[in-house]
Design a protein with these regions (language model features):
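Conserved alpha-helical scaffold segments that buttress catalytic/binding sites
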Residues: 1-178
């Protein structure tokens, strides 16, 4: 993925191999790897997996940088209530709030096209920043500060990401890259 790209400072590339039978073990590996990478005081870029991968990364990042905001580019909120012990892709943001790692005011949902019925109450109870696709310019003007940026492929228009399981997105590539 990085082949042929030029950077103005050294870049480290690392891999975390998932335990396909144990999500909690995979999260532990990702967390520990992220903690180690943050010690080098360089930006961390993570590619691959569903949004459950973001959970351990965000735990590590927030503990090392308490002022960080979360910009969540996704067609969906991912604030469903957790069922069982596993932290799946659709509960990540809610889990981060419930654990006290992020205040809702530090979370910016961008590109949201669908709010699930079982997410409405939690959304109304919290003061999240919510920007639908037609409000992307408003987000660009209002947002300030440092951020962990998470991009779910389903935020893109279905013509740009036809293989996603949730084809509700409405952003084009230029909007996402800004």
């Amino acid at each position: 993925i990085l082949e042929g790209l030029e950077f103005d400072r050294p870049v480290m590339v690392d891999e975390v191999f998932p335990d396909e039978f144990d999500l909690e073990e995979t999260h532990d590996r990702i967390y520990e790897n992220t903690v180690e990478l943050l010690e080098f005081d360089r930006p961390v870029v993570s590619i691959g997996g569903d949004h459950s991968v973001s959970y351990p990364e965000l735990k590590a990042l927030k503990r090392s940088n308490p002022d960080i905001n979360l910009v969540w580019l996704d067609a969906h909120l991912d604030i469903k209530e957790k069922v069982g012990d596993n932290i799946s892709h659709d509960v990540v943001v809610r889990q981060l709030v419930e654990e006290g790692l992020f205040d809702p005011e530090e979370i910016y949902f961008v590109g949201i096209t669908k709010i699930e019925h079982d997410e409405e109450e939690f959304l109304e109870e919290n003061n999240f920043n919510l920007y639908r696709p037609e409000e992307i310019e408003e987000f660009e003007q209002e947002f300030e500060g440092q951020a962990y940026i998470s991009i779910d492929i389903d935020v893109l228009q279905k013509e740009l990401a036809p293989g996603t399981g949730y084809p509700d997105g409405n952003l084009d590539l230029d909007q996402v890259l800004k």
